[in-house]
Amino acid sequence: PGLENFSGGAGDAEFWEDNPPQKSYVVEVSDNEKRFQSFQFTVELPVKGIYKWENIPAASPNKNLASIPVYSAPTRKILGGMSVVRAHLREAEGVPAAWAVLEARFEGNLVARGIADRDGQIVLIFPTLAPQSSPLVSPPATATQISLAEQNWLLDLTIKYEPDIFQSSPPVPAESEEEVFPDLRLALAQSTGRIWADTEQTEESETATLSLGKELVLRSRAAEILSPPDSETVYSSYLFVSPAI
């Protein structure tokens, strides 16, 4: 509604010189095959030509593109040759970290970004990184290369989480099955929060090791209990995070 005169216009140079009045519209994006997260964004229409996304964050993997970015849903099918990082994000009180943004970097370069769903589940899916050579040792003749099966990459992790930015009126109940469309620009504009290595939130987590051919599932260590010193570390089902302060 509101674009009737525009849709019947000639669309030529003279038409655009008359500066047809613009109105704000909310666009909702949903994938029936559940490959990508649902979201919404506001756009001023009409626009001349193809609409160009104007709010791609700095250092985005898509920084040279003007298309609207989409982010994988946890239910997306994984294709060959792709690396996967998963997490189920929670605050200390057990509240799902809905719409939190997780970023992974390797050697300072952003390799993937994901947005959590309303239950805090998130996945980053990206092409497998280039194989790494082992560092040179002395003498140089003893230098070796890591075999393909032993390849791994140390990723730097950042969480962007500012739940108050998504205040809706009225709020959608957590148990509701109604589809929710978080504002994409707001999601990407969230400030940096904290990732916790342990459930007691005494140690922050900033890195994780991705191994070739294996999904990396990020989880916080469970609280320590009396057990033999050589017992295996117990992990929670969740990766605990805190909002930006």
Predicted ranges, named:
Residues 1-10, 109-131:
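Short, acidic Ser/Thr/Gly-rich low-complexity loop/linker segments typical of extracellular
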Residues 1-56:
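N-terminal accessory interaction module
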Residues 14-16, 111-114, 144-145:
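Beta-strand-rich interaction surfaces with strong enrichment in secreted/lumenal proteins
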Residues 23-33, 133-141, 150-163:
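A short, solvent-exposed beta-strand micro-motif common in secreted/extracellular proteins
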Residues 24, 84, 98-101, 154-156:
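Exposed beta-strand and adjacent loop surfaces of beta-rich binding modules
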Residues 34-62, 164-223:
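Structured interaction patches on ligand/partner-binding surfaces of diverse proteins
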Residues 49-84, 90-95, 114, 217-244:
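Beta-strand-rich domain onsets/edges
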Residues 93-107:
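Short, ordered, surface-exposed loop/turn motifs in non-cytosolic proteins
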